[in-house]
Amino acid sequence: MNICRFMKILVRCFLCVTSLVLLLLPEVVLAQAPSEEASKSSTSQVWQVAVDGSGQFTLIQEAIEQASSGDTILIKAGTYPEDVTVHSKENLNIIGEGRDRVFITGEKRVGSLHIGKWPYGATNVMIQGLTVTQHGGLGVGIFNGSGVHLKQIHVKGMVFIQQVQGVYLEDCIIEGSETTGVAFANSTGTLVGNTIRHSDHGVAIGGNSEVTLRHNVIAHSLFEAVLITGQSKATLVQNTLVRNGGGIAFRDGTVATVRGNVIGFSAVGLSFSAQSHTTLAFNALYDNQANYLLEGTPPTPIPERAGKTDVVLAPGFVNPQEDDFRLRHDSSLLHIGDFSYLGALPPLSLSK
């Protein structure tokens, strides 16, 4: 009888302990979760590259190969004559001391800087504060991947983007390409606040791409500032396209929305294929030999493709002879439609 009672008590104790463990287990797991996340975030590292040996590496490529996802690479001032490739990396930041202090000049390969390489891409990689000089006609090549962000870099040559989603170019200077300044092939991206100059074409959007351009200055292109071909889609809002062979060319079956731009001092303002689809509004055209042309042999004027709210007005640039395309405070391009000003750059009264 005593043995039976003892067994019953033992079973009850076991059940109580088991219930208590089950009740406390979620709290234990939750208590451990933040520490695990903190452990993961604490593993992100900062690497330094310096040609004088004061960093952990003297070559940028060595630092990239060592870095893991989430790391940051800081590049000290100097010239780096090497071929740099970033691929199979996520959330990597590469930051130079400034585009007037850090120079990647390439060595043997076509393209001094590659982000992604077939079949490997790169995801959410940000590169900032350096200059890349073209090698073999290509400055920067971006292949595959997504979320590549170039900020405040100077590219002396072409930026070529192929099969990449969500590319973002911000406050960059791109110039001196032997072909195109920025070329998109079957990619999506956004260009904001860049200066693109002295190329054959400023920006070429081809294949099945979708690209937005806002507040860019594109000047001194041998041909069009922006060329859109294939089945691509483009949105251009408040850009200044001046001193080019042409402003914008809409080829093939392209679709585009074009609003608030300044297009001037060119042979042709806007050139259309018969198959293209465009929505134009509040664009200012000035001092072009022709504003709206239909492609053909020869091209013919097509004023019916103009936006109903487009204007033909002198922009009132500060000093166009010196490529200062800011607007004067008395510019005629202020407060037009829903824009406080047309073009890429604010008037002097609004400039900082």
Question: Model-predicted segments: where are they?
Answer:
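Extracellular beta-strand solenoids
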Residues: 75, 82, 86, 96, ...
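C-terminal accessory segments
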Residues: 304-352
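Bacterial N-terminal signal peptides that target proteins for export
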Residues: 3-17
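Bacterial N-terminal signal peptides
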Residues: 13-27
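Right-handed parallel beta-helix
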Residues: 95-101, 123-134, 147-157, 165-180, ...
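Structural detector of coil-to-beta-strand junctions
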Residues: 83, 110-114, 138-139, 158, ...
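Extracellular beta-strand-rich solenoid/capping regions of secreted or surface-exposed proteins
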Residues: 61, 66, 81-95, 103-147, ...
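Acidic Gly/Asp/Thr-rich repetitive segments characteristic of extracellular carbohydrate-active
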Residues: 46-79, 85, 331-335, 347
